[in-house]
Amino acid sequence: MLVGDDALMNKALRIRKMLGGGMRQIGSLAAAASYALDHHYDRLKEDHQKAKEIAAVLQQSEAVLSVEPVETNIVIFKLNSNIPEALFLDNLKAHNILVSDMGSGKLRMVTHLDYTDAMHANLLEILSKP
């Protein structure tokens, strides 16, 4: 149970939704997470390392204002105000790279089981370009 003022409760609701807490099918996601831990634990470490590598490249990019600390396979970042978000996303989409818009200027990239080493190298190369 969480108790707090309006600001805290609104923040908690936003985070819950961001993490999938508003989904009715949350049991399916929990089952997938359990399977991943049982069968792909070592692979999860690779995903986490790749996410950290993506974050490191983003931190060096002039287009990126900030990158949140990476603890899992999720990379969350904000663009500089002079970079049109739609143009940035469209450019990556043209290279078959999908980035989620989280709102409030935050963007999200996620590594996963089907994200290959070749895809990773390609992404890092594209993100490294000015």
Language-model regions, residue ranges each:
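Short amphipathic beta-strand starts and helix->beta connectors
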Residues: L58-V64, N91-L98
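PLP-dependent enzyme catalytic core of the Aspartate aminotransferase-like
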Residues: I83, L87, G105-P130
